[in-house]
Swiss-Prot record:
Motif (Nuclear localization signal 1 (NLS1)) on chain: 124-139
Name this polypeptide is given: Polymerase acidic protein
Gene3D superfamilies associated with the record: Influenza RNA-dependent RNA polymerase subunit PA, endonuclease domain (3.40.91.90)
GO CC terms: host cell cytoplasm; host cell nucleus
Free-text comment on the cofactor: Binds 2 manganese ions per subunit.
Annotated keywords: Cap snatching, Endonuclease, Eukaryotic host gene expression shutoff by virus, Eukaryotic host transcription shutoff by virus, Host cytoplasm, Host gene expression shutoff by virus, Host nucleus, Host-virus interaction, Hydrolase, Inhibition of host RNA polymerase II by virus, Manganese, Metal-binding, Nuclease, Phosphoprotein
Amino acid sequence: MEDFVRQCFNPMIVELAEKTMKEYGEDLKIETNKFAAICTHLEVCFMYSDFHFINEQGESIIVELGDPSALLKHRFEIIEGRDRTMAWTVVNSICNTTGAEKPKFLPDLYDYKENRFIEIGVTRREVHIYYLEKANKIKSEKTHIHIFSFTGEEMATKADYTLDEESRARIKTRLFTIRQEMASRGLWDSFRQSERGEETIEERFEITGTMRKLADQSLPPNFSSLENFRAYVDGFEPNGYIEGKLSQMSKEVNARIEPFLKTTPRPLRLPNGPPCSQRSKFLLMDALKLSIEDPSHEGEGIPLYDAIKCMRTFFGWKEPNVVKPHEKGINPNYLLSWKQVLAELQDIENEEKIPKTKNMKKTSQLKWALGENMAPEKVDFDDCKDVGDLKQYDSDEPELRSLASWIQNEFNKACELTDSSWIELDEIGEDVAPIEHIASMRRNYFTSEVSHCRATEYIMKGVYINTALLNASCAAMDDFQLIPMISKCRTKEGRRKTNLYGFIIKGRSHLRNDTDVVNFVSMEFSLTDPRLEPHKWEKYCVLEIGDMLIRSAIGQVSRPMFLYVRTNGTSKIKMKWGMEMRRCLLQSLQQIESMIEAESSVKEKDMTKEFFENKSETWPIGESPKGVEESSIGKVCRTLLAKSVFNSLYASPQLEGFSAESRKLLLIVQALRDNLEPGTFDLGGLYEAIEECLINDPWVLLNASWFNSFLTHALS
């Protein structure tokens, strides 16, 4: 690769790349892919600025031949390729003369025509992924980002590509040539894959024998043994040294390491605003099932047959009416959609043979509810270059929402036991090794604790719905297919039971990419009156569709039955993960196993049996405003499972960000509790990173409020 770079790139570029790598302490003999990447990036920056000038009238012009006259000024200032001190000097002088805002990171170019700094990216991956990484790092509206890929794709801020078509084509052609040259030498694959570096963690192992001798031989000068060197590293006082290094980087960096004390952290600031609303793909605690026991009807197991059989168990249907409208939707359309489902189910029943699947008639109400013909038409860019006001959509900032009590109630319900079993105990073969015996014993204990848990019902419901929807999306792309929402369980007496929660109607689903969206309308039965917590049901139109007789302590009472209707959407990748929800069982089992392992290592014997059978012992299950909550091992299993299930049901970028950033603060607090005297710099920045994820997501807001309870008790 090094030979290729020296042949392929201009010697001046190679020399600059060597300097850059030296400045960062990297060895170009080892980091050959990085060497190639730096040269490529430098060349793209130079090509970007080549031939572009500004004339006396302040217009941008292109001059390719001969010497430009003295009155022309270069349009771009090249910052990339200078050493850091010089680069910051150039940036500071540009900011002073033009009034531009000083960037946090060194940009690559400055554009005197558009008066903005430019960050150039060259990626071997998807342009949009790299663009987002750059944007997240820079976090500045002012710096313009322009990404090129080796496949000829590009992406720029607000689709503003700065340069003319021909100049950009020159860059793309050059990148394509580099790629082909690398490929012909067998270097491309390694170069392409090297863009994402994986972090490695070195454990502190005891080193003996030959490795020990090698370690002693490879110490820095002035250290006699590995122990000496380790003692020096462990006792190293970082403040002055790190500050010195950082001050060479940027004039604004200040990293005095502050001690982190009990009084240091503050609670997370949760947003104010209207209460957050339900956003799961199906109802959770509010769902109502129409069930048949010991199903043995003809076509048992075919969803549509099962659904019709379940529907026949209920006799309290009545003329539906809207009791809680959807603020922004056309509510009569939701009402008509339900009436259409009832009518078309009735039509099926009148047929001699019930079909296996049902495609709904494409009525105006369903077209509206499924967003048919609502997507803007895609037009080829070349066909509309001359349109004056062509621009990307403006997207509004999401509205801040406050934490509402319903999400804690949802979580509590998910931890409870139902009176049915939702998973079977695996029929496991004979154990061969002792370790298998322990593993299957743990699995059986765990399964018996969670098989009746409501979170397990949500798993099976989620797996069923996502599988059915993904199948229908591939098999009937153009059809509005009716998909019953079904689950299966066993009663206390071991009898099989089939449950119907409601229906989904799928919209058009030509899903080429993982993230392409399929719209669907969900219609779900419930006994919950939406008027009790209207804010929870903001995205729903709720109909009253019947009266149900409920057995209660005072005999039979009649309760209104509701139908929760909403338009929703999902994608191939979300459905794929939804189908994998059983993994939540595995994740929570592994967490329980690590607790058992910790106990076992203290007692020096396997504690599985005692762990599950000692009913008097309690274990911590979480924090609440009252303090650390403790409970039985069964409740611990169910709580861990519910957390894992909610992470899946309420998966979102806000949750990803909150989990990653709050974990850093959690580790610092735990280090303080373990008397490890942690130090931090830019704690304010960490709080900012955590709090920018607290927007409107109910599960993230609940986790943040739990985190605050943890902070209070951990530091009191």
